[in-house]
Amino acid sequence: MARKSLSSRQARREGLVARYADRRAELKRLVTHPDTDLSARDDAVRRLSRLPRDSSRVRLRNRDVIDGRPRGVLSRFGLSRVRFREMALRGELPGVRKASW
């Protein structure tokens, strides 16, 4: 089980990403667009660097929705491989069956 501080940090980052997503996307579009003049591009880079570091999507980590485990997360279910196996064997995941061939 992940520490509560890690889960709260992740939640704070998710909020920042959602809040700054439009602004960040617009600035990145200005920076990467080939027709943007140099002064506007420099200004966009400067404004982009002033945004909060945690507002970038790459700072997010996929975590198990139940216990917050950071590794081995199956994104389709939002569960770690360990939790997925436990729940699947108990029949708690609809439509999931153990493979047999």
Swiss-Prot record:
Lineage: Bacteria, Bacillati, Actinomycetota, Actinomycetes, Micromonosporales
GO biological process: translation
Domain of life: Bacteria
UniProtKB keywords: Ribonucleoprotein, Ribosomal protein, RNA-binding, rRNA-binding
GO cellular component, one term: small ribosomal subunit
GO terms assigned for molecular function: rRNA binding; structural constituent of ribosome
Gene: rpsN
Organism listed in the record: Salinispora arenicola (strain CNS-205)
UniProt xrefs under PANTHER family: 30S RIBOSOMAL PROTEIN S14, SMALL RIBOSOMAL SUBUNIT PROTEIN US14A
Quaternary structure (record): Part of the 30S ribosomal subunit. Contacts proteins S3 and S10.
InterPro entries on file: Ribosomal_uS14, Ribosomal_uS14_bac/plastid
Function statement: Binds 16S rRNA, required for the assembly of 30S particles and may also be responsible for determining the conformation of the 16S rRNA at the A site.
Family: Belongs to the universal ribosomal protein uS14 family.
Protein's name according to its UniProt entry: Small ribosomal subunit protein uS14A
